[in-house]
Amino acid sequence: MTELQQIIEAAFERRDSITPGSVDAATKAAILQAIDLLDSGKARVAEKIAGEWVVHQWLKKAVLLYFRINDNGIIKGDDAQYYDKVPLKFSDYSAEQFKAAGVRVVPPATARKGSFIAPNTVLMPSYVNIGAFVDEGTMVDTWATVGSCAQIGKNVHLSGGVGIGGVLEPLQANPTIIEDNCFIGARSEVVEGVIVEEGSVISMGVFIGQSTRIYDRETGEIHYGRVPAGSVVVSGSLPSKCGKYSLYAAVIVKKVDAKTRAKVGINALLRSIDE
């Protein structure tokens, strides 16, 4: 455990006594350092190590402590004023800083301090919360929301109105993760620490939480909390045990590899789900 982590862990144990006026200098400096590490992408709440996702809970604790040490303050916008504890990521950026970051931010897209936006990323009018990590080549489309501490991989497309859940409380919960090369269709919601594995395609209007049954029609297997790599998923339903009604489910209609996905294209994959 690093010294920074030790300070954060100790501060979190006494979090109820920490206020903007009472926080000691060493604790405040540690919290700000942790937020800067998240903001720069040098640290992230979750990362894949040896093929498994590892969650760094102490960084989530640092985010929660950040709220404890900040007073609300005015945040200026072009046409309005806002009042919050967390400043905006790009509020003081110059044209040179935007060029160096390699990101496009379309008004009125909002990213909070403590989120990381990698190069070659496009933020249409959307929202990225504190602690989130958005990797290279990703498109966050109009009115999409990337929740606190969510992890978005490389070359992901979050379509219009998509919601990726944030998980700061309960603290033991894992962040929602969208792995590399995934497509999330318009108005879909992925929440509660669900992992959408690499190369998956989620159709429009699919809702997936930890309790959602994810049914593979080819094998009959039911998954919870995880969409297997290369899955093409649509909204559907499964019959109840008594056969009197059906309940919502996400249905894996096919599996595709990277070569097929690149050759065929997203629309063709979704149009041919009855094949």
From Swiss-Prot:
GO terms classed as biological process: diaminopimelate biosynthetic process; lysine biosynthetic process via diaminopimelate
Functional pathway: Amino-acid biosynthesis; L-lysine biosynthesis via DAP pathway; LL-2,6-diaminopimelate from (S)-tetrahydrodipicolinate (succinylase route): step 1/3
Subcellular location: Cytoplasm
Any one of the GO CC terms: cytoplasm
A Pfam family it matches: Hexapep_2
Molecular function via GO: 2,3,4,5-tetrahydropyridine-2,6-dicarboxylate N-succinyltransferase activity; nucleotidyltransferase activity
Keywords: Acyltransferase, Amino-acid biosynthesis, Cytoplasm, Diaminopimelate biosynthesis, Lysine biosynthesis, Repeat, Transferase
PROSITE patterns xref list: HEXAPEP_TRANSFERASES
Annotated positions binding substrate: R104, D141
Coarse class of the protein's main subcellular location: cytoplasm
EC numbers, comma separated: 2.3.1.117
Keyword Translocase: no
UniProt cross-references to CDD domains, sorted A to Z: LbH_THP_succinylT
Cited SUPFAM superfamilies: Trimeric LpxA-like enzymes
Catalytic activity: (S)-2,3,4,5-tetrahydrodipicolinate + succinyl-CoA + H2O = (S)-2-succinylamino-6-oxoheptanedioate + CoA
InterPro entries hit by this protein: DapD_Trfase_Hexpep_rpt_fam (IPR005664), Hexapep (IPR001451), Hexapep_transf_CS (IPR018357), THP_succinylTrfase_dom1 (IPR023180), THP_succinylTrfase_N_sf (IPR037133), Trimer_LpxA-like_sf (IPR011004)
Subunit structure: Homotrimer.
Family, as annotated: Belongs to the transferase hexapeptide repeat family.
Protein name: 2,3,4,5-tetrahydropyridine-2,6-dicarboxylate N-succinyltransferase
Species this chain originates from: Aeromonas hydrophila subsp. hydrophila (strain ATCC 7966 / DSM 30187 / BCRC 13018 / CCUG 14551 / JCM 1027 / KCTC 2358 / NCIMB 9240 / NCTC 8049)
